[in-house]
From Swiss-Prot:
PROSITE patterns: SH2. This is SH2 domain-containing protein 6. One of its GO terms (cellular component) is cytoplasm. InterPro entries: Immunoreceptor_sig_adapters, SH2, SH2_dom_sf. It comes from Mus musculus. Residues 36-45 have a biased composition (Pro residues). Residues 187-295 form the SH2 domain. SUPFAM superfamilies: SH2 domain. Coiled coil: none annotated. Residues 1-61, 74-93 are annotated as: Disordered. Keywords: SH2 domain.
Length: 297
């Protein structure tokens, strides 16, 4: 029995496709719409070197389906045409931010702010402006009048100061001299205040007890005070100085009749022999007493 002859079927081979065929275009260039759920595949590492294609059949510009930063990487100018994607685009934008003029000036001024402040404010704030003369914009007649008036006012002020000083100086000197003459008197106490004198008189408890002390207030016209005890109450009567210390009077000003004395000692001597009228300022009661008991604290 003979075997049937073997039939050799013809083998059909697919024609060879070049690098830019349809299969390659599916990987490199997708002209159709992209599926939003599937991200595009990254390009192979063998076909890229610093963002430039090595294969000569690589498309020279990206198509609408595949976004590749080829044109941005080859263009050195700053991107002003829209947002730039890719690593090279980000580096370019960062370099542009650090080269802004305002930030350069700030970085230069930051290490040494004092010289900048001195240069910017030396002509205005650090050097005070020179005041202009008041009579620069006035006529000569008005300027002369103002100068004469200012000179007259200054002279009057100086004269007033001299007058006040000359009127106070004799009073102070006379009160100091009178104070020196009173130091030996048993009824005078130059180093006691009002409270200590009143305590001493109240402790003595006799009408007519008295004491002369320095006044509490800074009154040059009332350097001394006479303290007298009457009916359990202490009366403080000012001793006024008149005529630059040449005369002394007892009581406040405004009295119709007052007796003048040449010294405080003469006044005390007079009221040891003559009654001294006293008026209570709170109740208005009047009383008479003599200066009988000089008291020391």
């Amino acid at each position: 029995m003979s075997c049937p002859p073997v039939r050799v079927l013809p083998v059909s081979l697919a024609p060879a496709q070049s690098l830019g065929s349809k299969d390659d275009s599916l990987y490199l260039d997708r002209s159709g719409p992209l599926d939003p759920s599937k991200p595009p595949l990254p390009p192979p590492q063998s076909t890229m070197a610093r963002g430039l294609p090595i294969n000569p059949s690589f498309p020279t510009r990206p198509t609408s389906g595949y976004h590749f930063p080829l044109k941005t990487a080859m263009n050195p100018q700053p991107a002003k045409q829209g947002p730039v994607f890719g690593r090279q685009g980000r580096g370019t934008s960062a370099r542009m931010v650090t080269k802004k003029p305002d930030e350069d000036i700030y970085l230069e001024c930051e290490p040494d702010p004092v010289p900048v402040l001195t240069r910017s404010l030396s002509s205005k704030a650090l050097i005070p402006p020179v005041p202009l003369p008041r009579t620069s914009g006035l006529p000569k007649s008005v300027a002369g009048y103002q100068e004469a008036r200012n000179g007259a006012m200054d002279g009057a002020l100086k004269a007033g100061r001299r007058l006040s000083a000359s009127s106070i100086a004799p009073a102070l000197s006379s009160s100091v001299a009178e104070n020196g003459s009173l130091l030996g008197q048993p009824w005078y106490s130059g180093n006691c205040d009002r409270q200590s004198v009143e305590r001493a008189l109240l402790h003595f408890q006799k009408d007519g007890a008295y004491k002369v002390r320095l006044s509490s207030g800074p009154h040059s016209s009332q350097p001394f005070t006479l303290a007298v005890l009457l009916r359990g109450r202490v009366f403080n009567i000012p001793i006024r100085q008149l005529d630059g210390g040449h005369h002394y009077a007892l009581g406040r000003e405004g009295r119709n009749h007052e007796e003048l004395f040449s010294s405080v000692a003469a006044m005390v001597q007079h009221y040891t022999k003559h009654p001294l009228p006293l008026v209570d300022g709170h109740s208005g009661n009047r009383g008479l007493t003599y200066l009988r008991f000089p008291t020391k604290p």
